[in-house]
């Protein structure tokens, strides 16, 4: 018998009628009325669409339909009541996971952010003179001390730092850069596009794999405003290659009265090569080569908040501070608080390796990782019992964040093979958990890398896996 859509539609209860249901009255006591009402209307609209498309799926009685709607509203309200930005246990082994928020802040940085957010502060107030101050002065002395430069400026990310530098130094004029350095920095943002937005004109020189000093020299004209060096922090070209050194580029710039800028991308303040990582130039070394401006990120290898950090010659950086664009890309008090606290950790470089989570995760030894894996596997094995096979095996982690692209630090994974649940269902349940858990899937197993799992997350992670494997859905 063909169902009459109008008759089925009339079975749908009104909003006010639903709000008088006992379950929804309880929801109204726990959550804002506007949230519950919005959820009711959303679910009702979904049922209207179901009636039009598949009326046979609608429960036969008005009472059954109301019960189904109430259940869906309850689920919807609880989902909407959760913060959109949620905690995630990063079990991927990717230390600077861009999609999971990159660097985890140090304890001191967290306390500094809380202090700045919870109270008024001297963000732009000079406590000595009683007059207006500069927010950039809050980290200037630290950055000058740590990098050996004359001045600094902090903006909201490194792309903004590059944009501001190009806009200030080369708007309407030419910037020379090696063809092999025209990088894409993530999210489809590319150096040529950033340059176009700044108003500067790109002049490519050399080939993808080889660029010589003569290529730069031959491209210099009266329209040239800047020589740009972009460090390949997120990729490597190997084999038949040649790149002009910074010292050579600086000498050429001075010969022609042109400033030289280096975009480091990630930006190190400590050398990690002693831990087996490929050599990368530090900010100090880059600035020491004589370049006029260096730009780098705050939330990558520095281990701080998202920020674009500009250091260099005072005359050049001061020009950037006066650019109207600076106001549009400036940082807030919480970023500056976190950055200052992070930079202070670097006054004790050895201590920074332990206190800054990013550096601690990158420098952790194989013995420590193996012990962490053994403890986590023991907890999981005891909790999951015969519901899953738990094991350990050697593998590799990743640095992430567009940094150290060829590095593959060794690790020891904890593997989980569920017996009564597909991996697709398991990973979906873990993503829906609170906190969510994100690992990697290899060879039909869930793999958990202890490099990026904090010790105090072991019990939480074990409990989450216990719940999702023990609840039939």
Swiss-Prot record:
Keyword Ion transport: no
Cofactor(s) needed: pyridoxal 5'-phosphate
Domain of life: Bacteria
Modified residues (N6-(pyridoxal phosphate)lysine): 300
NCBIfam families assigned: selA
Protein name, per record: L-seryl-tRNA(Sec) selenium transferase
Known pathway: Aminoacyl-tRNA biosynthesis; selenocysteinyl-tRNA(Sec) biosynthesis; selenocysteinyl-tRNA(Sec) from L-seryl-tRNA(Sec) (bacterial route): step 1/1
Source species of the chain: Desulforudis audaxviator (strain MP104C)
């Amino acid at each position: 018998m063909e169902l009459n859509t109008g008759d089925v539609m009339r079975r749908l209860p009104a909003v006010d009628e639903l709000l008088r249901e006992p379950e929804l009255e309880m929801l109204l006591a726990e959550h804002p009325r506007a949230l519950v009402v919005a959820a009711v209307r959303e679910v009702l609209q979904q049922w209207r669409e179901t009636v039009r498309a598949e009326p046979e799926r609608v429960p036969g009685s008005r009472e059954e339909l109301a019960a189904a709607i109430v259940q869906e509203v309850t689920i919807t309200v609880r989902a909407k009541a959760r913060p959109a930005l949620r905690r995630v246990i990063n079990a991927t082994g990717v230390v600077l996971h861009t999609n999971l928020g990159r660097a985890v802040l140090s304890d001191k940085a967290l306390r500094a952010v809380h202090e700045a957010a919870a109270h008024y502060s001297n963000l732009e107030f000079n406590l000595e003179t009683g007059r207006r101050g500069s927010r950039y002065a809050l980290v200037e002395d630290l950055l000058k001390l740590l990098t050996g430069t004359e001045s600094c400026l902090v903006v909201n990310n490194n792309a903004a730092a590059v944009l501001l530098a190009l806009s200030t130094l080369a708007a309407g004029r030419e910037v020379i850069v090696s063809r092999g350095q025209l990088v894409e920095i993530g999210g489809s943002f590319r150096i040529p596009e950033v340059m176009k937005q700044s108003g500067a004109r790109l002049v490519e020189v050399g080939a993808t794999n080889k660029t010589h000093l003569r290529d730069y020299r031959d491209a210099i004209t009266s329209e040239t405003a800047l020589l740009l060096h972009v460090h390949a922090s997120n990729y490597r070209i190997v084999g038949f290659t040649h790149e002009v050194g910074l010292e050579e580029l600086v000498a050429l710039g001075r010969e022609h009265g042109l400033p030289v800028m280096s975009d480091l991308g990630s930006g190190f303040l400590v050398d990690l090569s002693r831990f087996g990582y490929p050599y990368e130039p530090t900010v100090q070394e880059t600035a020491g080569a004589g370049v006029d401006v260096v730009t780098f990120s705050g939330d990558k290898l520095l281990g701080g908040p998202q920020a674009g950090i500009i250091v260099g010659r005072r005359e050049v950086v001061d020009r950037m501070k006066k650019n109207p664009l600076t106001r549009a890309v400036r940082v807030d008090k919480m970023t500056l608080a976190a950055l200052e606290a992070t930079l202070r950790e670097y006054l004790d470089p050895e201590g920074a390796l332990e206190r800054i989570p990013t550096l601690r995760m990158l420098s952790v030894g194989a013995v420590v990782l193996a012990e962490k894996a053994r403890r986590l596997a023991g907890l999981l094995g005891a909790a999951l019992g015969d519901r899953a096979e738990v094991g350990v095996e050697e593998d590799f982690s990743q640095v992430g964040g567009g940094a150290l692209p060829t590095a593959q630090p060794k690790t020891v994974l904890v593997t989980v093979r569920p017996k009564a649940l597909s991996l697709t269902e398991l990973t979906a349940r873990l993503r829906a958990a609170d906190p969510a858990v994100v690992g990697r899937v290899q060879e039909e197993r869930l793999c958990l890398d202890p490099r990026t799992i904090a010790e105090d997350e072991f019990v939480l992670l074990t409990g989450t896996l216990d719940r999702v494997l023990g609840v039939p859905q």
